[in-house]
């Protein structure tokens, strides 16, 4: 049986926590930031957690994480 390949795009965007959940960064924070409010940009700094419905999909994409 061959090894399962890790989806490299997902591996760069998601990290697994000790409890087994996935965390990632927020979108909309790379450019065109002048029109966005300071409060919004500050809130985008925090990590985002993946919903349980999508976690199963990530488990298949990241088998060794």
From Swiss-Prot:
- Pull one GO CC term from this UniProt entry: cytosolic large ribosomal subunit
Keyword annotations for this protein? Answer: Ribonucleoprotein, Ribosomal protein
Q: Which SUPFAM superfamilies match?
A: L35p-like (SSF143034)
The Swiss-Prot or TrEMBL record annotates one GO molecular function as: structural constituent of ribosome
InterPro entries hit by this protein: Ribosomal_bL35, Ribosomal_bL35-like, Ribosomal_bL35_CS, Ribosomal_bL35_sf
**What's the superkingdom here?**
Bacteria
Q: Where are the transmembrane segments?
A: none
UniProt record, GO biological process: translation
State the family it belongs to: Belongs to the bacterial ribosomal protein bL35 family.
Quote the protein name from its UniProt record: Large ribosomal subunit protein bL35
Q: Which organism is it from?
A: Xanthomonas campestris pv. campestris (strain ATCC 33913 / DSM 3586 / NCPPB 528 / LMG 568 / P 25)
The gene behind this protein is rpmI
């Amino acid at each position: 049986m061959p090894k399962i390949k890790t989806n490299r795009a997902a591996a760069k965007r998601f990290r697994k926590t000790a409890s087994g959940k996935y965390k990632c960064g927020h979108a909309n924070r790379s450019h065109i930031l002048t029109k966005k409010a300071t409060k919004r940009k500050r809130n985008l700094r925090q990590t985002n957690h993946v919903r349980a419905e999508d976690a199963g999909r990530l488990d298949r994409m990241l088998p060794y994480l």
